[in-house]
């Protein structure tokens, strides 16, 4: 599943490519995603201009004029493909946004766990009301994290992945951030000291920022709208490195399951 860095890369690309473009029409080839596509999406968007593109958590928000927004979530395997001329449609091209200059944006999703909906301003505010803090903001620091973790008896990795507390830090970046901070994923969240919280907040920011600069991580499905792959996976310390030596100490990387998810860590470096 694309996590915060991948969605940020996509949002930045779309900001450069489709901001201020007028939508000529919207074609829906498959309405049956996990959450149904807004039924009158073509009527709502035809002739409208995209004023802004931004990200909230793992959602891409395209603000349309001043009254509404298109909300897109890529789910497990979704992609947004930007094309500058007509191309043959693929099997899983579910939604096609055609612009007045004949460029188009295609939502492709083999597993159909994605989301494409249109919301008015009030609906948009309510939709995002339960999401946690953005970890790349100035507000997210050691003090904030320490308060967030107080009295939380869950393991620290599961807390980092809780989007109601902190958005966008998925499995990959939780594992990598904890390694960089030298904190074991087995630790209870409430037991982290202020110094550890400060270090972890810094390393979450560093890990996410490094991943964005590298174009994200391409493991299976993820690609940028241009078709380019990300390459942050080449810089992983622990994720996917089971039975391989730690880059820091040569200890063998350990794989365990936490809350149904794979967790990779070095039990020598992380404590």
UniProtKB/Swiss-Prot annotation:
GO terms for molecular function: 8-oxo-7,8-dihydroguanine DNA N-glycosylase activity; class I DNA-(apurinic or apyrimidinic site) endonuclease activity; damaged DNA binding; zinc ion binding. It catalyses: Hydrolysis of DNA containing ring-opened 7-methylguanine residues, releasing 2,6-diamino-4-hydroxy-5-(N-methyl)formamidopyrimidine; 2'-deoxyribonucleotide-(2'-deoxyribose 5'-phosphate)-2'-deoxyribonucleotide-DNA = a 3'-end 2'-deoxyribonucleotide-(2,3-dehydro-2,3-deoxyribose 5'-phosphate)-DNA + a 5'-end 5'-phospho-2'-deoxyribonucleoside-DNA + H(+). Its EC number is 3.2.2.23, 4.2.99.18. Binds 1 zinc ion per subunit. PROSITE patterns: FPG_CAT, ZF_FPG_1, ZF_FPG_2. Its cofactor is Zn(2+). Gene3D superfamilies: 1.10.8.50, MutM-like, N-terminal. The active site is at 2 (schiff-base intermediate with dna), 3 (proton donor), 58 (proton donor), 261 (proton donor). A zinc finger (FPG-type) spans 237-271. PANTHER family: FORMAMIDOPYRIMIDINE-DNA GLYCOSYLASE. Monomer. HAMAP family: Fapy_DNA_glycosyl (MF_00103). This is Formamidopyrimidine-DNA glycosylase. It comes from Wolbachia pipientis subsp. Culex pipiens (strain wPip). The lineage of its organism: Bacteria, Pseudomonadati, Pseudomonadota, Alphaproteobacteria, Rickettsiales.
